[in-house]
């Protein structure tokens, strides 16, 4: 890859060629691009310059580890492209110092643009429990899940929404009709709130700092999904709980219906519900007891989710946070997976990640250290399966042979193996999160496998 000065030099050379050309854009040039040059108007650029801008943005990103977390590739390229406009329009293209001038001004513009990425809060409707009564906000790091009427009250209190708009939204949620607003912007914002929350009884909000809009939004969505997965860890079968915990932007209630024909028979299409519209129902005061019991889990997972949305990743325990972040993400994907064989692969990825990718022996060491099982201990009360055999089955047949395309069991029923994987993975993840909270000064992932 060419150096920074070489790339900027090639851009300046192309601009000089464009100025000297009599027929730009010619028949073979296509429609030229424009770069905003601020007070100096805009610059006409060709495909070669666009390619050089892409190369320049990749080089700048490669040399800036913080930017790789803060920006999506598209956002970073757009920012680099925009930063080039004013200096390129202001220099003398024949000045031997032009390259250095552009380089310095681009870096200065990038720093200024990044400093403007302040605090943002992203929100989306979600399902959780069947009733919102007596449910206090659930806080897991930067994520807050609250009943939509609580969220609306908070938006008014924090002056993020006007009282008139909030009153109209409550009326709409109660089934009332709304007259059109005179102010077009207020009308659009009101419609946005109603669309984004939808019929969901809860709202999931995520606060970010130092992230640009699109990257911040994507990280907020990821953190939201992970927070729901953490909440599902409180149930014996997390995937069933998570089926009723869902962001509105994800798939909604689904009724699976298939029409089947058999020779000589009249058959009717059966149906099965998935992506349920809500989760569990709690009696009055019951969730408060559960929330108190889950507070240590939410505190530990909160540190991990803070790492997910952190602008630079420079936190006190980056190594352990990174391992646990990936484990929670794999766990979420495993619970959501519709195909049993693929779910097994993802559940085992949770175990393998917690074991730092060191395979079957270290997964056994992890379960011994955190769960307390010896190799020959039975994992079920019935005594039908030893821990070492369970791990061998999951890692060998369930994970490795499937990933490498050598499994001869994909056409068989994997529901039992999925059940086994869903027994071990959440248990290991829970115990690792507990250890993470209890050992607040530790940042060596290998210690997860030490008693």
Language model: regions and residue ranges:
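Short glycine/proline-rich turn/loop motifs
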Residues: 310, 329, 377-380, 405
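Charged, non-catalytic interaction/linker regions at domain boundaries
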Residues: 73-342, 416-451
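Amphipathic alpha-helical interface elements
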Residues: 1-61, 65, 70-78, 93-123, ...
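Composition- and surface-driven signal marking solvent-exposed, interaction-prone regions
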Residues: 346-347, 361-368, 412-421, 445
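Short, mixed-charge aromatic SLiMs
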Residues: 369-382, 451
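Charged/polar positions within long, soluble alpha-helices
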Residues: 359, 400-407, 429-438
């Amino acid at each position: 890859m060419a150096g920074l000065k070489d790339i900027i030099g090639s851009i300046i050379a192309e601009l000089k060629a464009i100025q000297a050309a009599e027929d730009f854009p010619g028949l073979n040039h296509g429609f030229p691009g424009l770069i905003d040059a601020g007070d100096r108007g805009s610059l006409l650029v060709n495909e070669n310059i666009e390619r050089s801008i892409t190369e320049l943005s990749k080089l700048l990103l490669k040399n800036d580890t913080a930017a790789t977390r803060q920006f999506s590739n598209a956002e970073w390229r757009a920012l680099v492209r925009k930063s080039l406009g004013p200096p390129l329009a202001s220099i003398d293209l024949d000045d031997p110092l032009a390259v250095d001038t552009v380089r310095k001004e681009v870096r200065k513009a990038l720093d200024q643009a990044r400093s403007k990425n302040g605090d943002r809060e992203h929100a989306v409707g979600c399902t959780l429990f069947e009733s919102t009564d007596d449910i206090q906000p659930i806080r897991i790091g930067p994520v807050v899940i609250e009943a939509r009427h609580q969220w609306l009250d908070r938006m008014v209190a924090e002056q993020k929404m006007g009282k008139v708009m909030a009153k109209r939204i409550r009326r709409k949620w109660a089934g009332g009709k709304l007259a059109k607003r005179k102010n077009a912007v207020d009308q659009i914002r009101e419609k946005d709130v109603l669309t984004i929350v939808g019929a969901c009884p809860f709202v999931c909000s995520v606060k970010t700092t130092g992230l640009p809009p699109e990257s911040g939004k994507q990280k907020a969505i990821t953190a939201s999904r992970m927070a729901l997965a953490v909440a599902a860890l409180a149930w014996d079968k997390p995937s069933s709980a998570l089926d009723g915990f869902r962001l509105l932007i994800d798939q909604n209630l689904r009724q699976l219906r298939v029409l089947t024909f058999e020779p000589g028979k009249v058959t009717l299409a059966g149906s099965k519900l998935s992506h349920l519209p809500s989760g569990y129902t709690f009696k009055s005061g019951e969730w408060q007891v559960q929330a108190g019991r889950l507070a240590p889990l939410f505190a530990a997972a909160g540190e991990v989710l803070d790492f997910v949305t952190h602008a630079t990743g420079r936190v006190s325990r980056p190594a352990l946070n990174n391992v646990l972040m990936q484990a929670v993400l794999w766990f979420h994907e495993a619970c959501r997976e519709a195909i049993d064989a693929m779910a097994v692969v993802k559940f085992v990825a949770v175990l393998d990640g917690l074991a730092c990718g060191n395979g079957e022996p270290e997964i056994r060491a992890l379960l011994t250290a955190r769960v307390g099982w010896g190799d020959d201990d039975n994992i079920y009360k019935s005594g039908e399966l030893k821990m070492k055999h369970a791990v061998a089955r999951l890692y060998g047949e369930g994970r490795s042979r499937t990933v490498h395309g050598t499994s001869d069991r994909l056409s068989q029923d994997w529901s039992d193996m999925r059940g086994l994987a869903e027994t071990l993975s959440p248990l290991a993840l829970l115990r690792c999160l507990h250890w993470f909270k209890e050992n607040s000064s530790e940042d060596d992932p290998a210690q997860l496998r030490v008693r």
